[in-house]
Amino acid sequence: MTQENQNPPPEQEDVAADPQVNEAAASEPAAVKTPEQEIADLNQQIGELQDNFLRAKAEGENIRRRAVEDIAKAHKFAIESFAEHLVPVTDSLYAALSTDAGDAKAFKEGLEITLKQLLSAFEKGRMTEINPAVGDKFDPHHHQAIASVPSEQDPNTVVSVLQRGYTVADRVLRPALVTVSAPK
């Protein structure tokens, strides 16, 4: 035998000595999947994705439903807070009606106290009066002109207030009814 036959070429030695190459070669047949296996794997992935989709869809619907319920509760109980502030006013009015006092001055004082209670309840409910002063410029967003009368004041200014208006949280509930000065 010659020396060439006894010693393998250096390329063959490297391949035989490298265990990673041997493992890769051994695992290659296992990595190759049959079409049936690939179809089964893809069907499993489809099932998982459909399940995830349905769960996400159900979660979104639950969030939407809870949001609708929360809004309904907020509307329902928002008025409850305002109503709680009105109860003492009602109590005061019933107390005033039940007295037989003939004293007009005492009755007027009781009404003034009740009005203060009512205005306090309005304030707590973020409800404010629109009560323009005579001479204020007419504001169509907060005032409603009922009549226009000749006046010494500038045109389109408030001459008198017939009925106060109200806002709730900066939104006009009812405009103030006013008489304005006519253009000259």
From Swiss-Prot:
GO BP annotations of the record are: protein folding
- Report residue spans for region: Disordered: 1-35
> Which keywords does UniProt give here?
Chaperone, Cytoplasm, Stress response
- InterPro entries registered for this protein in UniProt: GrpE, GrpE_coiled_coil, GrpE_head
Q: Where in the cell is it found?
A: Cytoplasm
Cited CDD domains: GrpE
Family annotation (PROSITE patterns): GRPE
Q: What is its main location?
A: cytoplasm
Q: Which Pfam families does the UniProt record give?
A: GrpE
On the tree of life, the source organism's domain of life is Bacteria
GO MF entries: adenyl-nucleotide exchange factor activity; protein homodimerization activity; protein-folding chaperone binding; unfolded protein binding
GO CC, alphabetical: cytosol
Cited NCBIfam families: PRK14139.1, PRK14140.1, PRK14150.1
Cite the PANTHER family for this sequence. GRPE PROTEIN, GRPE PROTEIN HOMOLOG, MITOCHONDRIAL
The similarity comment for this entry is: Belongs to the GrpE family.
The subunit structure is: Homodimer.
Described purpose of this protein according to its UniProt entry: Participates actively in the response to hyperosmotic and heat shock by preventing the aggregation of stress-denatured proteins, in association with DnaK and GrpE. It is the nucleotide exchange factor for DnaK and may function as a thermosensor. Unfolded proteins bind initially to DnaJ; upon interaction with the DnaJ-bound protein, DnaK hydrolyzes its bound ATP, resulting in the formation of a stable complex. GrpE releases ADP from DnaK; ATP binding to DnaK triggers the release of the substrate protein, thus completing the reaction cycle.
Protein name per its UniProtKB record: Protein GrpE
According to its UniProt entry, this protein's organism is Polynucleobacter asymbioticus (strain DSM 18221 / CIP 109841 / QLW-P1DMWA-1) (Polynucleobacter necessarius subsp. asymbioticus)
Q: Give the gene that encodes this protein.
A: grpE
